[in-house]
Design a protein with these regions (language model features):
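Short, Lys/Arg- and Gly-enriched loop/turn segments at beta-strand edges
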Residues: 67-74, 82-83
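Flexible, small-/acidic-enriched active-site or ligand-binding loops
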Residues: 99-106
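Short, positionally conserved secondary-structure boundary motifs
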Residues: 3-54, 81, 88, 92, ...
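Short, surface-exposed secondary-structure edge patches
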Residues: 48-52, 62-66, 110
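Hydrophobic beta-strand signal
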Residues: 60-61, 74
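Structural motif
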Residues: 56-57, 71
Length: 127
């Protein structure tokens, strides 16, 4: 049995690096995910439903400023936080939804684009 760790929950769209934007802290078993996440992000929207990430879910995120092709990432694009699949397969960098109703997002050279972290799991709860 592993001990609990307390993780902050952030709402999508707020600065993830700001303590002022923490919804609340919740205990999470430290062996629930590997690697251990740094925070939970409350998902908003339906862009990732085809891989089982639904509106209101808590996405367990490991902080990282880089990710590899195919990773599910939390990215900041022009000030907006989004959860998408990173596509590095073409000459352009793209963020792909996992819902056919959403178009790919092409990252242009002038865009403010940062990887905030990558998904390590999902919690479906009423927290």
């Amino acid at each position: 049995w592993s001990s609990d760790c307390a993780l902050p929950i952030f709402a999508a769209g707020v600065p993830i690096d700001s303590v002022a934007h923490i919804e609340k802290m919740v205990p999470v078993r430290s062996d629930l995910f590997s690697p251990t996440p740094d925070y939970l992000l409350r998902v908003q929207g339906e862009s990732m439903i085809d891989i089982g990430i639904f509106d209101g879910d808590l996405l367990a995120v490991r902080k990282s400023d880089h990710a590899k092709h195919g990773d599910i990432v939390v990215a900041r694009l022009n000030g907006e936080v989004t959860v998408k699949r990173l596509d590095r397969s073409q000459k352009t960098l793209r963020l792909l939804a996992e819902n056919i109703d959403f178009d790919p997002i092409v990252i242009t050279p002038d865009a403010e684009f940062f990887i905030e972290g990558h998904a390590v799991g999902v919690i479906r709860t009423a927290l």
